[in-house]
A protein has these predicted regions:
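Short, solvent-exposed loop/turn segments at secondary-structure junctions
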Residues: 8, 55-57, 77-80, 124-125, ...
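Long, charge-rich low-complexity segments
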Residues: 210-215
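Short, conserved catalytic/metal-binding motifs centered on acidic residues
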Residues: 3, 48-54, 71, 118, ...
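An internal, acidic/charged active-site-proximal segment
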Residues: 16-114, 185, 190-194, 198
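Active-site-proximal, Lys/Arg-enriched surface segment
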Residues: 1-11, 68
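Basic, amphipathic alpha-helical segments enriched in Lys/Arg and hydrophobic/aromatic residues
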Residues: 153-206
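Short amphipathic alpha-helical "interface-anchor" segments enriched in bulky aromatics
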Residues: 126-158
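Long, acidic, intrinsically disordered low-complexity segments
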Residues: 102-133
Length: 215
């Protein structure tokens, strides 16, 4: 599980947690820990939190509202909205937008787009704004695709939690560096990897980030 920051030009993995069934913590517990770390340790002030429907639980949404944070999420069709199942709203019309409450009395704005439902507590924005904002979450999916395909994310042989954390951390760190290089050189991560594979001198031509610190 990873929480990332993006300005839509670059996307940086900020922190992560490894979920273990026997730890006594749920995925929602870990999600709250990551949010807390970003808000109160790193003191990041995000414009909003974006996540998929699994995390759109009453407890997590209320946690974000408590800390005055905006959220955008997809939501399952079997959730109730104004005490009626989403799938039964508006006679099954494929497109609509309405403000109301979901479980726990959480006030949200719901947008239906074809067969999918989206919620936000940023009440009053347009349907287009809500859908476009949620689409930014695709940047997170791109992180996992790239680190799995290109950086060996799933090829960790360590059985220890520390070893796995080190491996995942290195993958995310390399991804962040590649994002910085890609932005400075106006190239994609994949293009950088391809050129570096074909031209051994290519790395010397790049504008690289400056790293500081003592060993």
């Amino acid at each position: 599980m990873v929480i990332s920051w993006t300005n839509e030009k670059i996307t940086i993995p900020v922190a992560w947690k490894i979920y273990k069934k026997d730890s006594g913590k749920t995925k929602l517990d870990l999600a709250k820990e990551l949010i807390r770390y970003c808000l109160f340790t790193l003191r990041i002030q995000p414009q909003a939190f974006l996540f998929d429907s699994f995390y759109a639980s009453e407890s997590l949404l209320k946690y974000l509202i408590k800390h005055k944070q905006l959220f955008y999420s997809q939501i399952p069709k079997n959730r109730k909205f104004n005490n009626i199942f989403l799938s039964k709203q508006h006679n099954g019309r494929p497109y609509w937008q309405e403000t109301g409450v979901i479980r726990g009395g959480v006030k949200v704005q719901v947008v239906k787009n074809r067969r999918k439902y989206y919620v936000t507590n940023n009440i009053g924005i347009t349907r287009k704004e809500q859908l476009q904002t949620y689409k930014i979450r695709w940047n997170i999916e791109e992180i996992f695709r790239f680190v799995k395909q290109e950086l060996g994310f799933e090829r960790c042989h360590s059985q220890s939690l520390d070893g796995q954390n080190t491996h995942f951390g290195m993958c995310f760190y390399l991804y962040a560096i590649l994002q910085d290089i890609a932005e400075k050189n106006q190239m994609t991560d994949y293009c950088i990897k391809l050129k570096a594979t074909l031209d051994k001198n290519f790395a010397n031509q790049l504008v690289l980030p400056t790293l500081s610190g003592s060993a």
